From Swiss-Prot:
ABC transporter domain sequence ranges: 7-222
Entry membrane topology: Peripheral membrane protein
Molecular function via GO: ATP binding; ATP hydrolysis activity
Family classification: Belongs to the ABC transporter superfamily. Aliphatic sulfonates importer (TC 3.A.1.17.2) family.
Gene3D superfamilies, A to Z: P-loop containing nucleotide triphosphate hydrolases (3.40.50.300)
Gene that this sequence comes from: ssuB1
List of residues binding ATP: G39, K40, S41, G42, C43, G44, K45, S46
Gene Ontology cellular component terms for the protein in this record: plasma membrane
Protein name in the entry: Aliphatic sulfonates import ATP-binding protein SsuB 1
EC number: 7.6.2.14
EC class name: translocase
Domain of life per record: Bacteria
Source species of the chain: Shouchella clausii (strain KSM-K16)
Length: 247
C-alpha cells in the first residue's frame, strides 16, 4: 500500500443474516483527503462507516487502515455524559496530560469559557462542538462523521461546516463524511460517492476552489447533478429513472 494511503476498501460485502447491506464496495482515501458518502436512507451508508470504525467486520473483502492509525467517529447526537462537565467529557479516554490536551481541543472548537458547563446548559450546536473536541483530542488520522450536523438548524450547520473545514485543513487528517445534505457534501468533500442499494453507483470529483461559494454556478450545477443522481432523476427531462441505467 502507498505511504499516502489513509484507508481502502476492496471487494467489501456486508450481510446481516440473509440481508445483503453492502455489495462489492471499493474505494480508497489518501492522507489529508475528505470524501463524502451520500444516498437514500437505508442504502448502507452508516453500515459502511461502522466498518471503517471497526465496529463491524465485513462479511467478505478487506478494509485496510494502516497499523497504528487512530480512527475516531462523530455521530448525529453528541452522546455526552450528562453527569460530567464539558472538560470531563473531552478528557474521556485520555491517559496522559489529560487536562492540557482537553483544554486545547476545547479551544480549537471555540468553546473557551464553557469548560465547567454541564451538557444540559449547552445548545445543540455547542454539544456538537464538544463532541468534535472529544474526537480531536485523540489526534486522529481519520475522522468519521456520521450525519454530525443533521439535527442542527441551518445557520448552526453552516457555522459547524466552516469550523470542521478549518480544523481539517489545519491538521491534515483524512475525513469520511456520511450526509443526506448534498450541499454539505459539495462544500466539504474532495470527492463524493453515491451509494444505491449497498453499492457505489457513481463518483464525483469536486474540483472547486475553497472556501466554496454556494451561490456560484459551478457549485449549484454540481450539487444539482449529484442530487438528481441520488433521486434517480433524469436531468434532461425531469423524469424518475432507474439509477442502474445511468452510467
Amino acid at each position: 500500500m502507498s505511504a499516502q494511503m489513509a484507508l481502502s476498501l476492496s471487494g467489501v460485502h456486508k450481510s446481516f443474516g440473509t440481508t445483503s447491506v453492502l455489495k462489492n464496495v471499493e474505494f480508497s482515501l489518501t492522507k489529508g483527503e475528505c470524501i463524502a458518502i451520500v444516498g437514500k436512507s437505508g442504502c448502507g451508508k452508516s453500515t459502511l462507516l461502522r466498518l471503517l470504525a471497526r465496529l463491524e467486520q465485513p462479511t467478505a473483502g478487506e478494509v485496510y487502515i494502516p497499523n497504528g492509525d487512530i480512527v475516531r467517529m462523530m455521530f448525529q447526537e453528541g452522546r455526552l455524559l450528562p453527569w460530567k462537565t464539558v472538560l470531563q467529557n473531552v478528557m474521556l479516554g485520555l491517559k496522559h496530560d489529560r487536562k492540557r490536551k482537553a483544554l486545547e481541543a476545547i479551544k480549537s472548537v471555540q468553546l473557551e469559557g464553557k469548560e465547567n458547563e454541564w451538557p444540559r446548559a449547552l445548545s445543540g450546536g455547542q454539544k456538537q462542538r464538544v463532541a468534535l473536541a472529544r474526537t480531536l483530542v485523540h489526534s486522529p488520522h481519520v475522522l468519521l462523521l456520521d450525519e454530525p450536523l443533521g439535527a442542527l438548524d441551518a445557520l448552526t450547520r453552516r457555522e459547524m461546516q466552516q469550523l470542521i473545514e478549518k480544523i481539517w485543513l489545519q491538521r491534515g487528517f483524512s475525513v469520511v463524511l456520511v450526509t443526506h445534505d448534498i450541499d454539505e457534501a459539495v462544500t466539504l468533500a474532495d470527492r463524493v460517492y453515491v451509494i444505491e442499494n449497498g453499492s457505489i453507483a457513481n463518483t464525483y470529483d469536486i474540483n472547486l476552489p475553497r472556501p466554496r461559494k454556494r451561490s456560484s454556478y459551478e457549485f449549484v450545477e454540481t450539487a444539482e447533478e449529484i442530487l438528481n443522481r441520488v433521486l434517480g432523476v433524469n436531468a434532461t427531462n425531469g423524469h424518475l429513472v432507474s439509477l442502474s441505467n445511468i452510467k
